[in-house]
Amino acid sequence: MILMRHVVNYLQRIMIEYIKNIINDKPSIGVVLGSGLNSLIDSLENIKRIPYNEIPSFIQTTVKGHAGEFVYGTVKGTDIPVIFANGRFHYYEGLEYKNVHILIDIFYELGCQKIITTNSSGCLIPM
């Protein structure tokens, strides 16, 4: 039997270590926020913000309304550490697949036991 193992490249390791040094904790939950869901950040206290453009070699989101930052904190009134990715990456932005799922890789490497992904979707109904 061959066991699959999560592999992180050198640049990802630099990114992860940068984030770890700022949050100085192990988040138990990672949440990828979809468009319009950044108000969930208000549920946190003791907040630390890490803009994507400050993380060495990290890609930038190009979608309007995506802040492009990690937001770490504890859920208000608890000691539950959570990290939000406020701004995600899409294949239609012309990115390679490895960059589309980089947020999940980072949450995994930070030690998140649970990962929640969200999105905003809609449809057009012809009248």
Model-based region annotation:
Residues I2-M127:
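Metabolite-binding pocket within alpha/beta catalytic cores that recognizes anionic/polar moieties
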